Amino acid sequence: MKNVDHRNLDLFESVVDIARVSKVTKGGRQFSFRVAALVGDKKGCVGYATAKHDEVLDARSKAVRKAKGAMIRFPLREGRTIHHDCFSKLGASKLFIKPAPEGTGIVAGGAMRKFCEMLGVSDIIAKSYGSSTSGIVIRNAIKAFSLVCSPEYVAGKRNRKKSKFISKAVTQ
């Protein structure tokens, strides 16, 4: 899981959440806006960040800038799905992701669907349990996708051939 240089990528932006938040001081309430943004190239790189500012547009541009700096590359199988099932837990959020056959589409809800679209995953099944807050679901998705390993990576770590890790069903 390495940060990616975003300057030479063709990026797409998506706002996941906008919320008006307040800070209570001696003089009263101070309102500002919190924006959560996703940035991705739809080819395996995605970044997520949140930012606060007094104006929505300023908060959005700040969140997008931070998300570009936090971009991560994930391994995809055939450029459309993941290599294997994965379960992840972060706080009260639980997430199960599973590869799907070609043509299935993105079977996921809300923030997880946006995350998969920005990442470039076109066939996946994802189920989120527990907390459905968009920010925690996306952070949990980043954790889950970072647990997915390609057969090449596993073969290299174990000094084995890649064919030892691929089932016959996948190769056909």
UniProtKB/Swiss-Prot annotation:
InterPro entries associated with the record: Ribosomal_Su5_D2-typ_SF (IPR020568), Ribosomal_uS5 (IPR000851), Ribosomal_uS5_bac-type (IPR005712), Ribosomal_uS5_C (IPR005324), Ribosomal_uS5_N (IPR013810), Ribosomal_uS5_N_CS (IPR018192), Ribsml_uS5_D2-typ_fold_subgr (IPR014721)
S5 DRBM domain mapped to chain residues: 11-74
Coiled coil: none
One Pfam family of this chain: Ribosomal_S5_C
GO BP annotations, alphabetical order: translation
GO CC aspect terms: small ribosomal subunit
Annotated disulfide bonds: none
PROSITE patterns from the UniProt entry: RIBOSOMAL_S5, S5_DSRBD
UniProt-recorded Gene Ontology molecular function terms: rRNA binding; structural constituent of ribosome
Keyword annotations: Ribonucleoprotein, Ribosomal protein, RNA-binding, rRNA-binding
Transmembrane annotation, as ranges: none
Functional note: With S4 and S12 plays an important role in translational accuracy.
Entry note about domains: The N-terminal domain interacts with the head of the 30S subunit; the C-terminal domain interacts with the body and contacts protein S4. The interaction surface between S4 and S5 is involved in control of translational fidelity.
Subunit structure: Part of the 30S ribosomal subunit. Contacts proteins S4 and S8.
Similarity comment text for this entry: Belongs to the universal ribosomal protein uS5 family.
HAMAP family: Ribosomal_uS5_B
Name the UniProt record assigns to this protein: Small ribosomal subunit protein uS5
Organism taxonomic ancestry: Bacteria, Pseudomonadati, Pseudomonadota, Alphaproteobacteria, Rickettsiales
